[in-house]
A protein has these predicted regions:
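Hydrophobic alpha-helical transmembrane segments of integral membrane proteins
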Residues: 102-126, 193-211
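Aromatic-anchored segments of alpha-helical transmembrane domains
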Residues: 30-36, 125, 182-192, 209-210
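Helix-capping/transition residues at the boundaries of transmembrane alpha-helices
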Residues: 14, 84, 95-97, 166-170
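Aromatic- and glycine-rich beta-strand/loop motifs that create alpha-glucan
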Residues: 1-29
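Helix-loop-helix units of permease transmembrane domains in multi-pass membrane transporters
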Residues: 81-114
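Secretory targeting signals
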Residues: 27-77, 107-173, 229-237
Length: 248
């Protein structure tokens, strides 16, 4: 266990040298800022009961656009950096001299991806609170942060199949980024077409699956959500864990 923790620390040091952790944190503000401005328009405010309800709407939009669209791209790019850095620096021979198995090295990299996913989701939630507190009524932070953590874990787990493709079939960072963008657009398109696509396809894609689950979870926690059109599409937490666990 100590060796694994040391490996995780080493992987973070690699990202720190590239200043990517700071970029991930700044990226968390990419969607909350414009969405918060959008929420202040009269056309948007009249759709909500009060400012607390509008804050729920802002959080839901950040969850859908900021996290579930942007996070797979970030995870894919970070994975490419972590798995390609030994190749780029020609340090494979150095790793082979260390008494560590390939499984330990790969596990450490995957743990870093999950931590990055959770950190990004928490940062996005904090950004939503910071930009929303000036015009909306902020409340329910404990639940929203917990939901963001769950979403980060689920989205990262669902992105692991993409990482396999990136690592084994991609040879350049540009192709990796394009592949991640395509993957995110594919998932978001499927989510938008939920009323036209079979349930099986929607549940096999991590973003629609997580979107439907999070919508149902927010509804159960008293957040005003119109889920009439999603009837029959909302999975249980056990089903989400089972499906994403198989994917991962």
């Amino acid at each position: 266990m100590k060796e694994l923790l040391k490996l995780v620390k080493v992987e973070f040091q690699k990202l720190k040298r590239k200043k990517f952790i700071l970029l991930v944190t700044l990226a968390a503000f990419m969607f909350p800022l414009p969405l918060a401005y959008l929420m202040t328009t009269p056309a948007m405010m009249e759709q909500y009961i009060d400012k607390a309800d509008a804050f729920d709407g802002l959080f839901n939009m950040v969850l859908g656009y900021g996290i579930q669209f942007l996070l797979p791209c970030i995870i894919g790019v970070v994975a490419a950096m972590l798995f390609f850095i030994e190749r780029d620096n020609d340090t494979f021979k150095n790793i082979k001299t260390i008494p560590l198995s390939s499984t330990q090295v790969v596990t450490a990299k995957i743990i870093v991806l999950f931590i990055i996913g959770v950190v990004f989701c928490i940062a996005s939630t904090v950004a939503t609170v910071l930009v929303g507190m000036f015009t909306l009524d902020v409340y329910g932070l404990g639940y929203k942060i917990f939901l963001a953590v769950e979403t980060g874990i689920f989205i990262t787990a669902g992105t692991l199949p993409l990482i396999v493709i990136v690592v084994f079939f991609s040879r350049t960072y540009v192709f990796s980024v394009l592949l991640c963008i395509f993957y995110s657009v594919l998932n978001m398109s499927a989510t938008a077409l939920f009323d036209a696509l079979p349930k099986t396809i929607l549940w096999l894609l991590p973003t629609p699956l997580t979107t439907f689950w999070s919508a149902g979870d927010m509804k159960r926690h008293g957040i005003n959500m119109n889920l009439v059109q999603m009837n029959g599409l909302i999975p249980s937490t056990f089903q989400v864990i089972l499906i994403l666990g198989i994917m991962a």
